[in-house]
Amino acid sequence: MKIFLILFCTTLSVFADFAELVKSGDAQEAKFQYDEALKYYLPAEKLKPDDAALLVKISRQYALRMNDLPDKAGKTASGRKALSYAERAVALAPNQSDPHLAVAICLGKLTPFMGNREMVEASKQIKISAEKAVKLDPKNDYAWHLLGRWHQSLANIGGATRALAGIIYGRLPAASNETAVECFRKAIALNPDRLVHFVELGRTYGMMGREAEAKRYLERGLAMPDRERDDPETKQRGRASLKQLS
């Protein structure tokens, strides 16, 4: 009985320590302090290494800190680490939306540092992961956004990359700006406070030659306050697209 009580109290202590570490990490993440957040999340991982939700949080820190790193090597290393945590989360919780979304996000952030072949191969997995995330949680606005970005990207790739994509896919999967628009509109309906949905919808309309709609959504997104770490970079893309329309 005494041994049982000791084990019970020890277990309670571990859970309390874990919860406190995660809470502290969340507070740092809310301030965009990703390295500081990892100082709490990584010790929490040692207490509960099979907690998929925590692994998604860790993945997100490594993915977002890529923006703050000065060189390609550092960005790529951080992105790869983010991807490894996301893949672990998927293995532990294959029926949850967020781990699949994390894989899609990590691959999306890594694609600028890939060669054409690796980029096209990553694109295939992005689509699979984003579609899985949407299927598991149709109310996951960012999953719809990632699926929209996939359609937007593949619908507008250049000739050489398109030819390579055809070789890897065998036959290119259906992708269109129209489907991208549908995905971004769903994302906006689910979360109208995320400016990236508006900016990417506007950019897609611009790619379609629908300038009035492009300007309306780009200006709407650019007028919104920054709430997320990627928002300044998103606005840079939006301003560049708006300038091309002027």
Q: At which residue positions do the language-model features occur?
A:
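Sec-dependent N-terminal signal peptides
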Residues: I3-L12
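N-terminal leader/linker segments that initiate helical-solenoid repeat arrays
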Residues: V14-N67
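Short coil/linker segments at helix-helix boundaries
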Residues: Q28-E36, R60-N95, A102-K139, R149-K186, ...
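Short helix-capping/linker turns of helical repeat alpha-solenoids
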Residues: K48-D50, N95, K139, D193
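C-terminal/domain-terminus segments
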Residues: L195-E233
